[in-house]
Amino acid sequence: MITLGSVREYISSLGVAEDEHVYMGTLDVKQEKSLGVYNSKHQYSSHRALGGPDLEGYGEKYVTILVHWDKSPRDTEMVAVGLYETLRRARDILTEEGTIKFFQLLYDPQDIGKDDTGICEWVIEAAVIFEKKREGE
């Protein structure tokens, strides 16, 4: 099973933002040039193998990545699109909890406007497809 923590660690390893500016589950301080990784609040259908859980080869974890960057719409869009392209190409990422096979990006990065202080924000929605370990592996 891949957790939000593993996804956060991978996003941090990309070097888009400083490690201390990559948050998981909450973005309390809202510093400029930060990324937030959240469990998606959207509902998606559940997928199960016909033969039961022992035959499942992969799992899905739905996440939302918030790009909270600076007051420049252009700079913020560039960061969001760059991160999107990096995730689109990512394959077979080893984490402490298992292997992320790939990111299934659900749509292009979305501009969600500015926060209370005028910082531009974009979101990326993705399904993290990960390899499930079978019993005894």
How should each PLM-predicted stretch be described?
Residues 88-132:
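Acidic-leaning, charged glycine-interspersed low-complexity segments
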Residues 57-71, 120-131:
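Oligomerization/assembly interface segments of phage tail-like spikes and tubes
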Residues 55-61, 100-103:
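A short glycine/small-residue-enriched secondary-structure motif
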Residues 68-92:
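Mid-chain, well-packed structural core segment of small domains
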